[in-house]
Amino acid sequence: MRFAVLLALFGLALAARQSSVSEQYYRSGREYRYQFNGHLSAGLPIPGEENSATRIQSLIRIQPENGDFMRLQMTKTRFATSEEDRVLSFENMNEVPVSEKVEKVLSLPIRFSYRHGMVGEIEFSTEEQTWSSNIKKAVVNMLQVNLVKKGMSEKNEYETEHDNDFFLSNERTLEGECEVAYTKIEKSEKEQQWTKSINFEKCSLRPEIVYGRRYAEECNECRERDEKFSSTVFFYNITGTPEEFLINSVELQSKHMFAPVTEQKQLITARITNRLELVYSGEQKEQIEAVRNSDKKENLLYNPEHEIAEEKFAQTGDEKYLRRIPNYVDQGEIIRQQLNRLSKQTEQIELESNHVHARLVKSLRFATEDNLSSIRSLVSQKSEVVQSLYWDALAIAGTKVTVSHLLEKINNKEISPMKASQLMKILAEVRIPSEQIAQELHRFCESDIVSRSAVLRQSCWLSYGSVLNGVCGQTKNVYGSEITETRKQCTRQMKEKYIRELIEKMNQAESRYEKVLFVKAIANAGIDTSVVELEKIIRNQEVEKTVRMQAIDALRRLRLSMPKKIQNVLMPVYRNHKETPGIRISALHMIMQTQPTSGVLDMIVRGLEKERSQQVRVYTWSTLKTLSESENPAEKEIRRRVSQSLASIPVEEQKYLESKHKTFNWFNMQSGATLNWATIFSNDSVLPKEITASLETVFGGEWNKYLAQIGLYQNNLDSVLSKLLQKVEETGLEQLVVRGKRSSSFFRPAEMLRSLVESLRISHRQVPAMSPIAMIYLRYKDQDYAFLPIDIDTLPEMIRRVARDGQLDLSEIEKVLTQAARFTVAGSAFFHETVRKVPSALGMPQVMTSKMPTVAQMNGEVKFDLEPLNSDKFTGLRLRVKAEPHVASTHVCKLELFTPIGGQGIKLLHGGRIQAPIDSEIEINWEKKLIVKATIKSPEQKRHIAHFMTRPVLFSREVTMDKQMRQYPEPREKTIQLRENRFPIHAFERQYFEQTGLKMTVSGHYRRPFTTAFTLGESIMMSSSSLPRMLSLKEVVAYMSFSGFEETEMDEPRLLNRFYEKETELFETEKNVEYEQEDKEPKSSQLQSQIRKVKSEGKAYKHRVHMKIHTVGGPKTQEAECEIRALCDERVRFCRLNLDASRSPIQGESRQWQLKSSAEWLYPEVPSTMKKMLESRREWNAMWTGKWGSEKQNEVTIRVQGEQSSEQKFWMKKAEREQSPLTSGGQASRAAQLNQYNIHATYEVTPETEFWMENVYSMFKTYYFFSAEVQPKQNKENRIQCQITLEPFTRQLFNVTVMSPKEKLVLELENQQTPFRLPAVNIGREFGRVQSVRHVVKAVERQTRPECIVKSKEIQTFDEVFYRTPVMECFSVLAKDCSENPDFAVLMRKVSKRGEEKMWKVISRENVIELEKKSEEMSVRVNGKEISEDKWEDFGISQRGEEKFFIDAEKVTVEFDGFQAKIQMSSLYKNKQCGLCGHYDGEKTNEFRRADNEETDDIEEFSRSYLSKDDECEVDEQEMTNKRNYKVLREETSSSEEISESLIELYSEAFQSREAHHRLGRREDRQVCFSQQAWNKCLKSKDNKTETKNVHFKCLTETTRSPRISSVFSQADISENLSDVEGLPSLAEPSPHSRFLPCVIPSLSLSQ
């Protein structure tokens, strides 16, 4: 609409002229005059709102010459501006007078080649200025029209009619060399209308300059394809023919939209409308002067000379480039003014402080060395805060001049090393890097002052690498010199020189830290030539592993520019099974960052089938799985490729201590963020080798792969952990009696361990000697920002002195911590700054800037005290913090249009200021119980805490082109006032916490439109104020105390005794006689029996947590209190939890709000075998009652009973085949996971609570994850019953049935699984006696211990390799600590040659324990003496059940039933274990290591090496040499295969039990698939109605047990063969027209 009004005004103005147009085509010797009007505006994309506009008007004289040349002159040029919301005529705008010099430059003639409408070379006078030549190019650009279809690249796809024509061609225009689309319409025989459109998405060259995008990567998939951010369209009226023609009028419409945040929000728009109208053609009355000294020749492309001059000055500091910049202002005085203003602003940080600091940065970017030298004395007189902000401004400016000046200040020690280190971080993001700046940094990094400070040295070299990336790396920055110069800023010789210097530094480095530092500097540089040197480091096995892993990571900045090269380097490393898992996983991680092709992915997938390393296999699978589920639009293509490759991989179950990779996505439309989490484990450490968390974002079509990342890397920290734990244990043994007895003087277990090593010639299992190291690193914008190495070389001397003789020296701690520290910290930064310079169709530059200047200051004091003072030990500490932080930040989105009369534009300001005083004290005491007390004092005066605002501003500044200016031209600013009828103002004011005496007022106003989603707040203000002093709040006190493990008598259960009260039928369900036995007594009787048994044990422990918060002062004391009391028996089978809470009444309440609740739960007796689990019901019962409210009370009682579902009991019956009570424990453990929970709730609640409950209930019914089925049903009032059934194997599927008073609701997951295993109650877990925190930690640690199971002739190793070997009458070493100082050994032998009874011996540092079954009784000897049962517990021996005995030797535990045993060992013995239980390192390929630490494939040879022969035993050589006794049964197994096997059995049994209906099945590519629904069987004697249905299949991967899978087909009634159908998750298949009959096991109907 605005364009239409503008064109109408132009038409009226031109119609009023007495034009004389008598020509039909251009002829030499004639003159043609055009009226030129150009309108340039910037504003919000809201029609009818105010804009900042500039108008240029001129009379254009054109005189054709012979030989296809024309002369052009601009005359009567005028300028005008406006800030109105509509387009005005020139006379109604504010005309701006121009100087004679400007008018003279604009009137200089030009000469250009012009043939068939195409513009060639343009000649300018020597006096011509760059800005004026670009304006004249804009006029000439409107005359260019391709009449003869020169360079046509594509013909019209449609039929060409006689009056219509369309074609494409590549054309050089003012705005770039781009594809141009033409359309011609014939109006008459000699009159045509031409339309010309520039396609900016297909440009080979654009004079566009971009800064601040060095770290972003293009995300083509993130952009909306139908959105045009730049468009320019021409409309021509032409008479004549292509050879002889005349342009009567030209209209140009151009638009540029800028989206600084997201492409869905176009916040700022620039519009250009130009028009050329022929007003005269006829005789030349005055010839245009010839172009003087016409050696200055250019093409039609925009000339970025001014922008290049700015770049060159920033890069080199040469002042000659400043003289080429129009409107240059001497910066000396301006910097003085800004510093003085900044001094006033630092007294109270406000939003204006950001603007002052941003202007200071802008001025410094044009400052010369003389300017900075002239203000030395002024800076020295300023406060430390102002000086700190000034140093930051110099670093942010980032020019050669400011960088040199800053480094000089650091060398002169005017800036502290810590502050200098922070400045180096800012220099890493220098806006326009150059070779000169890099050289300055390199010299500084080599200086003495840097070498003396480790922190400064690290920052300097990392920043040097980042600057090199800007100079020689491949970034998205576009510099002006790249548009006009063919020579690149960085040559190959320069790249090789930089990398060679860093490699030499790395090779010369003596410490591991120094080597890692220079590798990280190379990583930051991201130069392509570094790949060769990094490959040498990666492939060199002699290089330390830490350095090699860092070298792999150093390839990350080249992942998209050199993907194939990186894959060629790292794929051999990944596929080399001799490499350590840590190296291989790092290689895989980097390969996946290159977004590999399907061929590379297939290689990785095929390698998984033969992969022996558990860590590598699991990490590879989790990485591929994560990528296949990625929501990041930047990974759309790689997600598709990975999904295809992943289809052939069986699901890999991930254990807790295994490598894995996870992502969490937050995406809306094409923008969002991804949080990545990865853990890498290795076979030489129980601790993770590396833990990383990274954040990547997609905004505005740009992908920031590593916006922020934090990681922890360690190597060989296990040795430190082992020593620490051993030290703690030894210290405790000196103070406490160790299990009652110690070794006698004649019986020395330690000597027995050593003699065992000597007799079997056991070699020490020891990882290669390597000093421990830990390293925490931070990355920002894909650059290594900082890293902290922790090893013996880098620890400060002060920390080394803290530990003396294994004890902490309190005097050293007090000396460091108790000194009160007063501090004043100030800093500033541009957290985000991007600049985009684009030429407009008027030949004037338009600059889009997005930045976020931030200024912060904090004054405060910190004091730390140890209590009590002057004591040998301390029992408490006190921390006092008093500070007042001030932070102000503004996000500025600005579009500025530069013209010969100044600059106009629009900016959006989003600012915030926070001033939050902190005055708090924390006291901690642990003498008798843990007590934490925190006191927070309130402000004594009224304070403004926070202020946020957002507003659009129009601005303009007037400058003169004809002279150098000495003062900064302050812009005139005007806030855009949005129309009230379209954007009404909404004001608000809220008050909070008035009752506490600390009234907080939140007030503000915002504008919200009626019809669109556009929201723009003008000002939103938040403030906090206190009441008058006599009533004001003084402080808030929070208190917490904890006491635990206080021994007491077992109390009578109070709730569970009432579990079946008045509800005798509760939870009684119909039994399935096929696999559930009839109970001899009801559930209620069973529960009472369990309660009596628990109570009879007598001993229990109570725990208490008390929390309270209250106010001091104010009109009334406000408080809230919570007390949690717990009581558990020592085996944690029964627990009671009481929670009491209260708070003071709040607004609308007159009474105190209170909560009183109690919960009890009871575990059944732990079943030792599957048989015992099947003998009777094993239920977990819990009950909770709660009562809460103020005036009105709510009361709820919930009963929960957990049990096995019918399906799980069926599986238990099938699995109950193992005769040994011990070896069926694994199956019993899985079966002990209760998968069905019956919940019964009764309630009496207030209407408000009932309304909330109904909302939650409705949300679940409509949640998109669920498929809901609702059946109206009348049930009892105030009662809800619910049944939750988990799929028992993977626990990633569940069904929920809810019975409310009015309906029955069935919820099922809709064709998907939960991303994690759902928690379930395990009635098989047994912690032993839990009497202290130490016991809790110990019990949890044992849950993750590896286990070795030893049967009569079969052994399952710690790494889950199954093999067969005979057991002799001589002792064999099963498990042993084979380190230099062994802690334990576990041995076993047969008691007799023909019997199966075994004798076990467990040797620890303290005792030798022997167990042997004699006459159905267990004989126990300790240190050679038989001991009675009442003393077993003193030595860690206990009996569990009737047949199992348990030995706890701290580092190792053994369960033994007289025949078979299970050994569990601490994970700290990774790579230190030896014996028949294998070489424990997490891998399955090297289990058979003989006693001399040599690997062998001969199991007999392996077994003999651990056979301890003596005079008391004899080896049966015939049995020993029988080869049939030795065999690897399964080298690897996985729970997924076990699950598949179990499912096969279940499906098989289900098929046999159904005769009325059948399932559909098909087989393909190592998979057997069954339909998830059962269907009525078609009877041949009847006519069947059929319809097409979608059949969902569950596919099981075939393993080595394929015959078992195949047998399902023969057992099941599968009459339909679907082998002719491709592998699709959902198939269309005819089925009988009848209702669905549920499967015999519906909870096992897994979704595909």
UniProtKB/Swiss-Prot annotation:
Glycans are attached at residues 237, 371, 683, 1295, 1584, 1617. The record marks 741-742 as: Cleavage. It is found in: Secreted. Disulfide bonds join 178-203, 219-222, 1348-1477, 1370-1513. Residues 1346-1514 form the VWFD domain. The precursor protein is probably further processed into vitellin polypeptides VT2 and VT3. Both VT2 and VT3 polypeptides seem to be N-glycosylated. It comes from the Eukaryota. InterPro entries: Lipid_transp_b-sht_shell, Lipovitellin_superhlx_dom, Vitellinogen_b-sht_N, Vitellinogen_open_b-sht, Vitellogenin/Apolipophorin, Vitellogenin_N, VWF_type-D. GO terms for cellular component: extracellular region. Keywords: Cleavage on pair of basic residues, Disulfide bond, Glycoprotein, Repeat, Secreted, Signal, Storage protein. It holds the Pfam family Vitellogenin_N. GO terms for molecular function: lipid transporter activity; nutrient reservoir activity. Residues 26-691 form the Vitellogenin domain. Transmembrane segments: none annotated. SMART domains: DUF1943 (SM01169), LPD_N (SM00638), VWD (SM00216). Residues 1070-1092 are annotated as: Disordered. Residues 1-15 form the signal peptide. Precursor of the egg-yolk proteins that are sources of nutrients during embryonic development. This is Vitellogenin-6.
